[in-house]
């Protein structure tokens, strides 16, 4: 996984990603910013949509003072942004955050709890939730079932089985692997 994510260089060959591929990696060592709530971290998965909404609001403000020619262009720009927001389920952000929070047991902790007060396992759940909400083209998961109880593992199985993009995962949980993957590559370190 370290070679795939670029943290280590391979002894031979290279790893290349297509230009427009977004890969998301669950790094269990990522620091979470003190003062942010679980809800804020999960919602940050949609920052690009929130930025788009700000851009749309800026266009609406300009419309109040625009002449006829400018108004036409502003309306087209606003329409394009509105279509993008709708296509990316912008108006469902809160319900998606709630769903993932509930599914990973974060709602039981309280979505408004400061992430600096969480245990290591709880922080990992927050990072997993954010990553799942980001829906990258390729999801890279390193031991995703660590810190998850049976019901949360079952939810993750369903999520991955329905995931429309590719994912690569490392796990020692054989029943979990057998239920979510269609290709297994077993790497064994052999010392010479």
Range-by-range predicted roles:
Residues 1-192:
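ABC ATP-binding cassette signature C-motif
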